[in-house]
Structure formats: structure tokens, C-alpha cells
């Protein structure tokens, strides 16, 4: 409440959220701070970083459900850091109905620069950026 009041004192227009890392992936059933109605009522939307682990897509899907508290839900950082691109796609497909927005992690280089070996990760980042570019541009109905 104190943080939101301080922001609203200077800016009544911009949306407010608190980004979190997905502790529910590590501790099944863990609830984020904004799960509390006293906290949630002050937020305009919920945001979380999500990095599914290889072989644990269902666990990641189940963990994301904890963050669905009746507010718009944005996965504000996602990347196949610990899973394959195919597993990340499964995660996105299985949760897209409850996620209102997706923002990927970006390394500051073009696809071509990554193809030519830009660090970090080079070719794997190029493949992800191509995937993400192909996924983009969809509007929710």
C-alpha cells in the first residue's frame, strides 16, 4: 500500500505491479505476496518471470496457476534457459488461455548477430528469437 500510494502521488495513470520469480516452481503450493487480498487490491496486474525446467512442463503449468488471482497476468520474462524450445512452446500453449501478455528475455543482439556467435548463447538465442518472432503479433480476443 505504501509503495502504491507513493507512486500514485506522482502518477495516477500508469499501471502498477510487483514482479516475482516463480517460487511455486520450487516450492509447490507456495503463494506469492500478492496472493493476499490486502496486497492484490492495490495492483493493476500480476507479473512473474518463468523459466520451465526440462522434463517438468506440467510442474511449471501447475505452478503458474498460483499466480492467477483474478487480475491480468503477464509473464514478463520467459526463455528456454533450462528446457528445450519445444518444451517452452508446450508451456506457452498450455498456459496461454490464462496469460494476458508475454514478454521474452532479450540479449540486446539481432538474430543475425546471434547466428554469427554473439554472446551469450549464440545459435540457441537465434533460434529462440526466430520462434518468438513467429509467435508474436497475436491479439487476444
Feature locations, PLM:
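Extracellular glycoside hydrolase catalytic/binding regions
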Residues: 1-110, 114-129
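Carbohydrate-binding surfaces of carbohydrate-active enzymes
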Residues: 131-141
Amino acid at each position: 500500500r505504501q509503495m502504491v500510494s507513493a507512486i500514485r502521488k506522482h502518477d495516477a495513470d500508469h499501471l502498477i505491479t510487483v514482479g516475482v520469480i516463480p517460487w511455486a516452481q520450487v516450492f509447490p503450493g507456495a503463494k506469492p505476496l500478492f496472493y493476499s487480498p490486502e496486497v492484490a487490491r492495490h495492483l493493476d496486474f500480476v507479473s512473474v518471470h518463468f523459466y520451465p525446467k526440462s522434463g517438468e512442463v506440467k510442474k511449471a503449468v501447475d505452478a503458474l496457476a498460483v499466480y492467477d488471482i483474478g487480475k491480468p497476468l503477464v509473464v514478463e520474462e520467459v526463455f528456454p534457459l533450462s528446457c528445450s524450445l519445444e518444451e517452452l512452446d508446450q508451456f506457452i500453449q498450455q498456459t496461454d488461455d490464462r496469460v494476458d501478455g508475454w514478454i521474452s528475455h532479450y540479449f540486446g543482439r539481432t538474430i543475425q548477430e546471434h547466428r554469427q556467435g554473439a554472446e551469450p548463447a549464440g545459435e540457441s538465442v537465434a533460434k529462440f528469437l526466430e520462434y518468438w518472432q513467429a509467435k508474436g503479433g497475436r491479439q487476444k480476443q
